[in-house]
Amino acid sequence: RGAGFLADPEALDHFLEEVFAHGDQKISVKTRLGKYHPEEFEEILAVYNRYPLEELILHPRTQQDFYQGRVNLGAYAYAREHSRNPLCYNGDIRCASDGKRLMEQFPGTDTVMLGRGVIANPALVEQMEGRAGEELDGEERGADADRVLQGEGGGGCAGGDKGGEGEEVWLGVFVGHL
């Protein structure tokens, strides 16, 4: 439950082994760096690297950090260098300039998962796409929401994973593509 597996990488490995042994669904995982210490991430990432994840969504804080303090961008850089799976960034994108700074610091980052930032600012995706100030009517805004929820525009982080018989399994709160 939650970040519980992060304290026991062996149990996480066993769980993922079972998941991948019993299905051919695309699986994305949202993770933190560890339960208590960022140094736990190296071992946790080694576990994730044993499996063909559709995407690894990284919130670069520990579970104990909750949402306090700064995200650990050094750990995100480590993940970019060492992850065998596609990577999605999650954490502290509250305004378009936060997304821009992330892109400048980490060129090639093209997917982010937005959480509290988009709840506080529902226009955040539009602002990140450079459409700030555009007046969208209800139909256009609904079409934008549908596009994001269906994952159009590329990348697994935008929608969800395909479940059995074409069914969508939504795994995130809200995601935007930069």
Task: Name what the model sees in each region.
Residues 1-178:
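Flavin-dependent oxidoreductase catalytic cores
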